[in-house]
Amino acid sequence: MPRAVSDELPVAAMVLDFGNVSTSVVSQYLILAYDDEYSINYFGQKLRPYWRRNGMQALDLLTAAVNDYANLQKQCEVFDQELIDDITKLGGEKYARVCALAYRQCLAGNKLAADANGQPMLFPKENSSNGCIATVDVIYPMEPFFLFLSPTLVKASLVPVLNYAASDRWKFPFAPHDLGCYPKATGQVYGGGEKTEDGQMPVEESGNMILLIAALAKIEGNAEFASLYWPQLTKWINYLEEKGFDPENQLCTDDFTGHLAHNANLSVKAILSLAAYGYLCEMRGDKINSAKYQKLAKEMAVKWASAADDGVHSRIAFDKPNTWSQKYNLVWDKILNLNVFDPKVTVQEIAYYKKVAIPLGLSYD
């Protein structure tokens, strides 16, 4: 009978005989696998797991893993060492350990499925909240991992959202928050869903999508992917141009804090999104709009520095003196080499963060 996983939780046990203890090395292994015939309900389409895209069955998967075990193990060891070495060179041993944990979380928190043509579609799941699938502000912090290791999977995570946003189902001028509740990607469930703007994240998600698509274009050296969805990007940038600098009483990815009007960090995201759109225009050969949006972003950045100023740091919101918050969205100014904000802004922010950080890290505000 169907039941919850936590109800009479099943336990599997295995006994391996390693023989008598001696100086000789003995090695054995177990294979754990999950045979999901279908992975995701994507708007009525039952998507197969990616490994099944060419007709492979569970027994085939296990057999292939056993037959190629030694080679796969070697590949994993080589990759692990190369990754850790690269990260250690960038930030040291402690930083490498944190990144190793982030690697596991980014990869394990996703389901890789195949569409009808066998193309990859990547669906993250919110594992510590309401189980939303393909949440844009979960994709956003996850994406640098895939930008670094697999731009193909960047596209695989963005395409489901972009296709939904381009459909008749999504009627708003801003980007959606999610596609449903895992494993059903059948329409947004967060906030007002598809019905109202209540509880949405308009500036947050619109900015996220534009910044990520610009980052992908930078990695690939062209804006071909962006061009496939240009009407959606243009719609979102029009919204950000009107609403982004001084956000209304909206939620952002830090929704545990509740609604916050005049959110300074959210404003940073909108400003850099305008510049990122200008960057995409430049790659598409549209010099007029490229100049327009990059100029607009730089003008807003100057206004932002004044509106958010609180002495030796910036405010959490334009109307809240004697406050502060992390301005992590500033990172895209550096990643995309947009040069929108005065470098003094970042220098000042980081200097203050170092003062208020505790051994366990830096709080949000």
Where are these regions (language model features)?
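Acidic/polar, glycine-enriched structural segments that form the non-catalytic walls/loops
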Residues: M1-A134, K155, L162-S167
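Residues that flank catalytic or metal-binding motifs in active/ligand-binding sites
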Residues: P10-A12, V26, E205, L266, ...
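Aromatic-rich carbohydrate-recognition surfaces in CAZymes
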Residues: S22, K46-Q73, G131-D246, N263-C281
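Extended, well-ordered alpha-helical segments in internal regulatory regions
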Residues: L32, I40, I271-E282, L330-F341
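Structural helix-adjacent loops and short alpha-helical linkers that scaffold large soluble proteins
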Residues: T88-R97, L147-L158, A217-T234, G278-K298, ...
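Acidic/His metal-coordination segments adjacent to aromatic residues that form catalytic metal sites
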Residues: A116-P124, Y182-M201, F245-A264, A308-R315
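Extended ligand-binding clefts on enzyme/binding-domain cores
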Residues: E126-V138, P144-P151, L162-A165, W170, ...
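A compositional/structural signature marking long, glycine- and acidic/polar-rich segments
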Residues: T234-S325
